[in-house]
């Protein structure tokens, strides 16, 4: 209601965006100020819920979501393929320097519960068979997986493109140049025809400029 009154009084355009949490915190929000400076007349409402990963939320003007295949009957643009790489905390690496040589034997593994086979797929693509871990920690969201690795709870598979700031800051250490190319991609999605709206067109152009083929 307040936003509606503001729009009526000041002519501000409203844009409702839904983004999965890790993408929002690591990519979108750090760069959003440049969009706001360029389009000060667009008010953005960002929802970071993660309950509709495989569909475009009905209440959203624009969403950024992981899809295995491009959704039909929507205006879609692929941003980049999801790639997973092994990572752990500097402290865990110091305790187990063999990790950098690919030896994960006897170490705790952190598993994203929505991707239960990711470690198996990574092992097959990397070459050596994955040794039995000392324990397995399962977590519901990708950002909680990364946080657990940051806290030294184990070795995790984290999204390569979304974790670059953690690697640069030294809070996570990438353990290998190898990465697992998944079958999923991040897509920018809007309803058919909404791309003609000025605020949707502006946001899409900016997103593609910042994150296309990241």
Regions found by a protein language model. Name each.
Residues 1-9:
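Alpha-helical linker/hinge and terminal dimerization helices associated
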Residues 8-15, 103-105:
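Immediate post-signal peptide segment of exported/extracytoplasmic ligand-binding proteins
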Residues 11-72:
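Central regulatory/effector-binding core of bacterial HTH transcription factors
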Residues 16-18, 63, 87, 110, ...:
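Short, well-ordered beta-strand segments
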Residues 21, 113, 190-193:
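Short loop or secondary-structure boundary microenvironments that flank
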Residues 27, 195-209:
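Short amphipathic alpha-helical coupling segments at ligand-binding clamshell hinges
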Residues 57, 69-153, 158-183, 210-214:
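C-terminal regulatory
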Residues 87-90, 186-196:
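A bilobed periplasmic-binding-protein/Venus flytrap-type ligand-binding module shared by bacterial periplasmic
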């Amino acid at each position: 209601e307040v936003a509606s009154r503001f729009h009526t009084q000041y002519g501000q355009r409203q844009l409702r965006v839904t983004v999965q949490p890790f993408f929002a915190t690591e990519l979108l929000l750090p760069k959003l100020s440049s969009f706001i400076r360029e389009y000060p007349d667009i008010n953005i409402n960002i929802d970071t819920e993660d309950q509709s990963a495989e569909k475009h939320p009905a209440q959203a003007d624009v969403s950024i979501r992981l899809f295995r295949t491009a959704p039909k009957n929507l205006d879609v643009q692929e941003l980049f393929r999801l790639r997973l790489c092994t990572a752990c905390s500097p402290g865990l690496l110091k305790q187990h320097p063999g990790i950098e040589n690919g030896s994960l034997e006897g170490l705790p593994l952190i598993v994203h519960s929505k991707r239960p086979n990711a470690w198996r797929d990574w092992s097959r693509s990397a070459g050596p068979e994955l040794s039995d871990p000392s324990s397995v920690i399962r977590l519901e969201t990708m950002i909680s997986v990364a946080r657990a690795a940051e806290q030294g709870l184990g070795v995790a598979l984290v999204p390569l493109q979304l974790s670059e700031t953690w690697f640069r800051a030294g809070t996570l250490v990438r353990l290998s140049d190898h990465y697992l190319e998944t079958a999923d991609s991040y897509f920018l999605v809007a309803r058919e025809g909404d791309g003609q709206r000025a605020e949707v067109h502006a946001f899409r152009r900016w997103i593609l400029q910042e994150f296309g083929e990241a």
